[in-house]
Amino acid sequence: MILTHTHMVFENLITYGILVDPVQIIAFALSDPNTWPSSYLIIVSNIFIIIALHIERSLSALAMSEKMGYTIQMINLGAILLIPLIVLKVLTTSTAVGSAMVLTVHSIIFMKLYSYHEVNRWLREEWAPLGLKSAMKQPGITSCVFGNDESNSYWNNIDQVITYPDNLTIRDIYYFLLAPTLCYQMNFPKSSKVRIRFLLRRLFEMIFLIHLFVGLIQQWVLPVTRKSMMPFVEMKLTIIIHQLLLLAIPNHFMWLIFFHGFFHSTLNFIAELMRFGDRRFYRDWWNSETLTYFWSNSNIIFHKWCMRHVYRPLVEMGYSKWEGQTFVFVLSALYHEYLLAAPLNMFRLWVFLEMMLQVPMAWILSKYVRGLYGNAVVWICIILGPALVMHMYIHDYYVFQERKVNA
């Protein structure tokens, strides 16, 4: 495998030469500030945050009914997702990268504020009438307020225990929004101090991996795309397979670089800067023998949010565990489709359908394939899975943009 990959690298260098140019990306980003509506949309998102805080304060003071508060919350949350879509659709000057960034930020704010509203509702229902000692005995309340068992070792480092409704402050909500978690709780575990060396190592990793990621695109992906200059929707099946195989290896490298750069370097950098104690962002997904284990351990932050605010409520409503898991997977597939198809303005459902195909594949793996064979199948699904299908979108977007320029 090492020899094969080395051969492919040298073959690429001999064929195309050295194409890596970090300055090109910076020059493109700074070329025209008027094409940055995404930056303004991210700033505007603060309005939704302030509205969410005001709703919770009003509910805690009994200034509005729960029904009215819930209605306003849903309108506010819906606006977080819909307004950037409408603005980006009208203002065509925004770049695809900028659009993807703003939709990612707004979707993260949506999930965080949904968790914020839900937890505060639980606290209003169970904490206030019972008091501290009685509430601590209630199942589910402890994890909402003090965190889960994995974080209890950091308890002594929490500066001050906050109780409801003293948590409804600007400082509290913005700490939660900036922290590397999607699930709200009043008292987050904290480390005792900021480790400067650890922070600098993570910063160096982030800078290095960003340049490596961009270099792979310039050196490996763009030449292959330019060579075909035909969108996948117009290709024959044999050409599609050939093109995907050419992109599979660089795409997989890019996925691994992105994973390490984001889930390890970036999230740990943010956590260290904020003294955030719960650092379990992923587990050993590379040892996965089933797709279920892979999806639940490669992104623990999102998995926790889905389990807490989607899966468990569905099970409590009477749905089976399998139905709950399937719904979570459908939600995840729609989320990935939203983040990719909307910025590129290409609604083809490729990512959604590919991820939905993994539902029966996950069932087959869990029933009939285990051990090393199961791990091998999981890796094949990773290499030829959603990441590669996402690349199909980007490939077609690039081809269509080149056609517009040359028209």
Q: Which stretches of residues belong to each language-model region?
A:
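Non-catalytic, membrane-anchoring transmembrane segments at the edges
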Residues: 1-152, 166, 170, 242-251, ...
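Hydrophobic alpha-helical membrane-embedded segments
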Residues: 4-8, 107-123, 210-214, 254-276
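Membrane-interfacial catalytic/cofactor-binding modules of polytopic membrane enzymes
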Residues: 154-205, 210, 226-344, 373-407
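Core alpha-helical transmembrane segments of integral membrane proteins
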Residues: 212-215, 219-228
